[in-house]
Structures are given as structure tokens and as C-alpha cells.
A protein has these predicted regions:
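Short amphipathic alpha-helix segments
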Residues: 8-24
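Charge-rich, low-aromatic oligomerization/scaffolding segments with amphipathic character
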Residues: 47-59
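Short glycine-/aliphatic-rich beta-strand segments at the starts of folded cytosolic domains
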Residues: 1-8
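Short acidic amphipathic segments
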Residues: 21-33, 60
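A generic structural motif
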Residues: 37-42
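Conserved short beta-strand edge segments in small beta-sheet-based binding/regulatory domains
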Residues: 59-66
């Protein structure tokens, strides 16, 4: 699944975002692309289940691929 981030992103956002996504699914593979402002997550969960974690970290995202 892939999410588009509407907020500005910096390289120091990568760690907190990865931890937030792994709080939803500890086995998830998370890839953050700061330049493209996208986050790819390989998980068996539904994309909607990650939206709360993004919101908790104050990121406004949309699902662009499920």
C-alpha cells in the first residue's frame, strides 16, 4: 500500500513515521520517500488501519495505492 503525504517532510521525519507505522503492525515493512512525499507499507492489514497512526503524528495523508 502507498500513502501520499500532504505535509512538508524532512529526513528526520523518517524514524518517527516508521515507528508510528510499526505500532500498528510490528512486522510491516515501511519505506519513506521524502522527495516524493510518499510512504509505502508492506503489511497484511488494510490501509485504513494506518490512518490513525498518521493522524497521531500530525500527518495529513491520502491512500494512493492499496
Amino acid at each position: 500500500m502507498k500513502f501520499s503525504v500532504k505535509n512538508e517532510m524532512r529526513s528526520d521525519d523518517i524514524g518517527p513515521l516508521e515507528r508510528a507505522m510499526k505500532s500498528v503492525d510490528g512486522d510491516a515493512k515501511v519505506a519513506v520517500d521524502v522527495e516524493a512525499k510518499t510512504i509505502s507499507i508492506d503489511s497484511w492489514l488494510m490501509p485504513e488501519e494506518f490512518l490513525v497512526a498518521f493522524d497521531d503524528e500530525n500527518y495529513d495523508v491520502t491512500i494512493i495505492e492499496s
